[in-house]
Amino acid sequence: MGNGMNKVIDGLYLGNIRDSENRDSLSRNGITHILSVCNNAKPVLEDMTYLCINAADASSQNLSQHFKESIRFIHECRLNGGACLVHCLAGVSRSTTVVVAYLMTVTSYGWQECLTAVKAVRSFVGPNYGFQQQLQEFQMKQVSEYQAWLRASYRSSPFKDQEQVEALLSLFAEQQQQGQQNDPEWMSQGSRIYPLSYNQYSASGSNR
């Protein structure tokens, strides 16, 4: 499933920089909006609506500061009948972090469950250690606030996001049982969920 962009839920896709410039694939998947999260992110195609976030794939990069604008961009796109591709360079770390933050906001699932759901459709994803810390911090301190903000700012969601993520979790469990993802490549450093203590991110004292 690593070839090309992958559908996560209705109106939300995850991919790499090549996917963001592939007109055939963009058209085939009905993409109208592109959220670019990479070094020197900039609009490329004139007929797309962009949100460009300049961010490095480094543990010291503060990506959570961009969660709210990213969530707004994705949600408004979907509510207006569009489809959003979120991408970074490889479609593994930065873009996955943003997608997970969005899924956390539109469902009741935590960051690890949302990341697992994404792995059901794109098995090799894996936010770096710093981004996982930021997702944990988001879950601990901000996600309920963002959920309330989303409910207050927009009409009732017509989407079945909770059910779709639940279905992805079931799919991932089935994949595990079938042994489809028990190869060493999938368990590589890039796709690993790191063991984080509950207050690990806060204890680091970082102002990323």
Curated annotation (Swiss-Prot):
Major subcellular location class: cytoplasm
Catalytic activity annotation: O-phospho-L-tyrosyl-[protein] + H2O = L-tyrosyl-[protein] + phosphate; O-phospho-L-seryl-[protein] + H2O = L-seryl-[protein] + phosphate; O-phospho-L-threonyl-[protein] + H2O = L-threonyl-[protein] + phosphate
Gene3D superfamilies: Protein tyrosine phosphatase superfamily (3.90.190.10)
Signal sequence coordinates: none
Active site: C88 (phosphocysteine intermediate)
Subcellular location: Cytoplasm; Nucleus
Location of the Tyrosine-protein phosphatase domain: 4-144
Cross-referenced InterPro entries: Dual-sp_phosphatase_cat-dom, Prot-tyrosine_phosphatase-like, Tyr_Pase_AS, Tyr_Pase_dom, TYR_PHOSPHATASE_DUAL_dom
Main EC class the enzyme belongs to: hydrolase
GO MF terms, alphabetically ordered: protein serine/threonine phosphatase activity; protein tyrosine phosphatase activity
Keyword Nucleus: yes
PROSITE patterns found in the cross-reference section: TYR_PHOSPHATASE_1, TYR_PHOSPHATASE_2, TYR_PHOSPHATASE_DUAL
Keywords linked to the UniProt accession: Cytoplasm, Hydrolase, Nucleus, Protein phosphatase
EC number, UniProt record: 3.1.3.16, 3.1.3.48
GO cellular component terms, A-Z: cytosol; nucleus
One example of a Gene Ontology biological process annotation: signal transduction
Similarity section: Belongs to the protein-tyrosine phosphatase family. Non-receptor class dual specificity subfamily.
Biological role: Activates the Jnk signaling pathway. Dephosphorylates and deactivates p38 and stress-activated protein kinase/c-Jun N-terminal kinase (SAPK/JNK).
Name by which UniProt lists this protein: Dual specificity protein phosphatase 22-A
Source organism per UniProt: Danio rerio (Zebrafish)
Gene: dusp22a
